[in-house]
Amino acid sequence: MRIVVLGAGVVGVTSAYELARAGHEVTVVDRQPAAALETSFANAGEISPGYASPWAAPGIPAKALRWMFMKHAPLVIRPRLDAAQVRFLLAILRNCTPAAYAQNKGRMVRLAEYSRDCLTDLRATTGLAFDERQQGTLQLFRSQKQLDAAARDIEVLRAGGVPFELLDADGCLAAEPGLRAARDRIAGGLRLTGDETGDCFKFTQGLAGLAEEGGVRFRYGTGVERLRVEGGRVTGVETTKGTFLADAVVVALGSYSPALVAPLGLRLPVYPVKGYSITVPIVDAERAPVSTVMDETYKIAITRLGTRIRVGGMAEVAGFSATLPPARRETLAMSVNDLFGGAGDLSRASFWTGLRPMTPDGTPVVGRTPVAGLWLNTGHGTLGWTMAAGSARVLSDLIDGRAPEIESADLGIERYVAPDRRARPAVRLNPARQAG
């Protein structure tokens, strides 16, 4: 089939690679001049299936109220006159029950674990190098209360067969010797021995190069305007550089996906949640992290990427704003300096922000839509790097009519569409409206 993939971030590029490997004729369209220049550019660098957790969790509403008065709050909500934001926040609240949390986390861990296996396969077959490390990740607790609260996640990990170690403060130092100066601020930690780290940007650019060598066409600097629909079926994409005809279209545009599919009658519950990172050159390797340390208090991940430290995290619900407030940089610098003081030169840190495409339940939307020829691979939130390879493999299997290797029925848009809407005929779609 002729397949057009919209988006050249890590999700779009892995999708294109898998589809081309399955024998399809693939074209990737992206508005940027190269791959991985938006949300995939400078993320936290962790590949953490065991930490795959929805933001919607029991206790989050109360915590969000307390965070409103914190200088270094992990979550900031900036209210807007935006119906999509209101719907997103209300849907988040509905998912904050213990039952919903357990279901959503289990689904996320399932996809993330599978994705790690797929990434291992890709690394073996392609030989790509991306500052990767297979040395586990450590969730660091600064209080006994945080340590006690981890019991809920541990039960999910145990049920899913995910290997882990529950550590005291000395155990944390054994895993991450660079934390020794912060010993008095550590209550314990949860270490996932199977987790990995790596530079998402390097990986995506490298895989895009291999995909291009394998016949995938990349059309950079090309803006997507609308989907082309004929006879109730998507037949291509209209762009700033002409029309691309296709037998199937995969939407992997992250936070921009809902605007494109909305004219077709699809309400895709993906909303941008802003994240930040700084990248710091290492000046003292002995004080630097070995792998990833997740500071549970501030929801910040501190990751070793070769000769650099990537410090990323926080969540800001502020629409599509791409501003870089100095206060966010200050929080990131504070966290890494508090735990790994002297490891990096903060005066030379680069500051970045990206829009993570979040769903209310934390799980991406992967699979077919009610519109013939239209497929989705979007909404991975903070876990695009963790889930990309597995999501791409699942998508390729579904497009080819193969049963994926993991349960995938609960990954599609169907979980957000009422039964009566699923049955509506495709002729009701409106292909003429501008998508965004």
UniProtKB/Swiss-Prot annotation:
Coiled coil segments of this chain: none
A GO cellular-component term linked to this record: plasma membrane
UniProt keyword Nuclease present: no
GO biological process: D-alanine catabolic process
Any GO MF annotation of the entry: D-amino-acid dehydrogenase activity
Binding site for FAD: 3-17
Keyword Nucleus assigned: no
Cofactor: FAD
Pathway the protein acts in: Amino-acid degradation; D-alanine degradation; NH(3) and pyruvate from D-alanine: step 1/1
SUPFAM superfamilies, alphabetized: FAD-linked reductases, C-terminal domain, FAD/NAD(P)-binding domain
Protein name (Swiss-Prot/TrEMBL): D-amino acid dehydrogenase
